[in-house]
């Protein structure tokens, strides 16, 4: 999983990318391409 400062460009990488909030953190998940996963953090 990649840790990015901003997920804006990351969520447009694939049409199956979804933005989810879990436990106060923002994640990008993709069930079709799991290698597109990312978490927002500084």
Swiss-Prot record:
**NCBIfam families linked:** PRK00831.1, rpmJ_bact
> What Pfam families does this protein map onto?
Ribosomal_L36
| Keywords for the protein's UniProt record, in alphabetical order | Ribonucleoprotein, Ribosomal protein
Disulfide cysteine pairs (residue numbers): none
Write down what this protein is called: Large ribosomal subunit protein bL36
At the highest ranks, the source species' classification is:
Bacteria, Pseudomonadati, Pseudomonadota, Alphaproteobacteria, Rickettsiales
Q: Which HAMAP family match?
A: Ribosomal_bL36
Q: Which InterPro entries match?
A: Ribosomal_bL36, Ribosomal_bL36_sp, Ribosomal_L36_bact
| Molecular-function annotations in GO | structural constituent of ribosome
**Protein species of origin:** Wolbachia pipientis subsp. Culex pipiens (strain wPip)
Q: Name one GO cellular component term.
A: ribonucleoprotein complex
Give GO BP annotations, semicolon-separated: translation
Q: Does the keyword Ribonucleoprotein apply?
A: yes
Which family, according to UniProt?
Belongs to the bacterial ribosomal protein bL36 family.
